[in-house]
Amino acid sequence: MSFRTIEWRDNKVIMIDQTRLPAEEVYNEYTDFQGVAQAIRGMVVRGAPAIGIAAAMGVALGAREIIADSFDTFYRQLENVCEVIGRTRPTAVNLFWGLERMKRVALQHKELNLNSIRELLKAEAISIETEDLAICKEIGRHGAALVKEGASILTHCNAGGLATAGYGTALGVIRGAHEAGKGIRVFADETRPWLQGARLTAWELMKDSIPVTLISDNMAGWLMKTGQIDFCVVGADRIAANGDTANKIGTYSVAVLAKENRIPFYVAAPISTLDLKLANGDLIPIEERASEEVTQIKGIQIAPEGVKVRNPAFDVTPARYITGIITEKGVVRGDYERELKALVGQ
């Protein structure tokens, strides 16, 4: 891939600014955890796995900012750093997974001096990024096996290299099928209101010379009905124990339409996106974002001033609409509650 979503370089976090794509390919530098938190909140970086990496790197930066003379003081301040970052995006469970992993590293090495702990936290954050790339390629390998030769694939939002350390989850499946020479083509929903499909997915696939056609969100059902879609694959921000899946708003509609038209609908996500503490999707917190994201496009007002707006960033697709969940350890189908627990060794 010709871009890097996020990386640690010279004690700085470097992120591609996804709010400026596709017009400009700009990389921002962050030297403190507050900047990283603002980048997560402001959608400079987005996508559950990428948010988890950013959160971990933000903690590593925060650890370098802490002035303390004991581990207890250091750890209390580290928890404050995690709390600030944790308030940015409540739905993506990878965010909290990354924070907990960083806190665990600090606690496991509390007998070391603080500079050594800071270095271990930096190393852990970098490891999370490295691991994610390998995980996405495994997801792509498992998912590509499900795709038939010449398939037309529909995807929603962006679950690609921009949403991960690289390669992607849903787009990892697409990349895997493309690399296997299956002659696929992709239909990308534009994905209002942030237009991740139009701005990001189309940009990524075009850079990789994967055939892609952009469609408006309300075209998907008609394309399915007229036999133009063979396979649907999306990412996930949180998956409950029963397989209910939170993903970008509009995913539920795609899943229902796919089932109505007898088209397989798959979710592609790493195991870190599972939240087996939640029995079902009704318990997943749904982020509500600013009304201006709906009433404006690039600062231009497109709706009447003062109109009431709902802007949930995510919806929850019940497990009954999901053909299978593609993870780095394989594909889970059917009895999600039992199979997801088995996948993580519970």
From Swiss-Prot:
UniProt: substrate binding residues: 46-48, 89, 196, 247-248
InterPro entries assigned to the protein according to its UniProt record, in alphabetical order: IF-2B-related, IF-M1Pi, IF_2B-like_C, Initiation_fac_2B_a/b/d, M1Pi_N, NagB/RpiA_transferase-like
Gene Ontology process terms (BP): L-methionine salvage from methylthioadenosine
Function of the protein: Catalyzes the interconversion of methylthioribose-1-phosphate (MTR-1-P) into methylthioribulose-1-phosphate (MTRu-1-P).
Pfam annotation, one family: IF-2B
Pathway listed: Amino-acid biosynthesis; L-methionine biosynthesis via salvage pathway; L-methionine from S-methyl-5-thio-alpha-D-ribose 1-phosphate: step 1/6
Catalysis: reaction(s): 5-(methylsulfanyl)-alpha-D-ribose 1-phosphate = 5-(methylsulfanyl)-D-ribulose 1-phosphate
Designated name of the protein: Methylthioribose-1-phosphate isomerase
Organism, scientific name: Citrifermentans bemidjiense (strain ATCC BAA-1014 / DSM 16622 / JCM 12645 / Bem)
Similarity field: Belongs to the eIF-2B alpha/beta/delta subunits family. MtnA subfamily.
Signal peptide positions (record): none
Annotated GO MF terms: S-methyl-5-thioribose-1-phosphate isomerase activity
